[in-house]
Amino acid sequence: VERRLKEAFPGITFDVHGVPKDVAGARDLAERDKHEFQKWITATVGAQPYKGGKKGMDRGIDGYLHFRDADKKPQFAIVSVKGGENITSGMVRDLKGTMDREKAALGLFLTLNEPTREMEKEASSAGFYETGGMKVPRLQILTAAQILDNRRPQVPFGFTEGFKKAEREKSGQDRLL
């Protein structure tokens, strides 16, 4: 809703209550409801929650981020979210396996906590995704702190198409004519 309001009414200002604004808020949400944390962080990076955010077996997939390559062919990233305290390189390895199984171009590991050095090594071992002269890490790790600081996944051409765009509303002045 927030994203669509901003698209429809550029320059609009409003407050959203109940959504994390800092790491403490993200941690509180994760402790209270892991599923809501997962939906929040997935949507915040512009991805779609798996099966619309419904609970159930997800086979290691918490969301998808859709984009197009240099040839305008649809591609996707698999999103894996970990909101717990204990995260390991095995979790990144599992995402890499899921990416291969699902033939995903990219993988996004979204976490509440800072990754370990071993996790970063595992992510970098996935290599790079290249299209149209652009090169981005194939498996990317982003923390809640980075996301709250407006850092987003590196996607070729910076273009994602996860959600339908809201139509831009005409200003009040335009309606008077």
What is each model feature region?
Residues 1-177:
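Mixed-charge (Asp/Glu-Lys/Arg
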